[in-house]
């Protein structure tokens, strides 16, 4: 299991709120676009309902805030494009490098 430094854990707890708010703001704009389509109103409604059903499970919306999950949560946030590697600049160099190594391995 990956050992998270206290300093990285503190940074993560501070940043996650803003990351999630930004992600949900992006989602809200996309939801508005769905509702404003020139489609059947029922289709727009059900498309939006389906989209929200899937989005509400993403780490960018709801997160398991355990220190032991932080590394995996960061990887999920990157995968979902909630954050970019540049968003990790405040974290320790070791943590950034470990994340980059896994991202490169996963392709």
Description of each model-found segment:
Residues 1-107:
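Acidic, Ser/Pro/Thr-rich low-complexity regulatory regions
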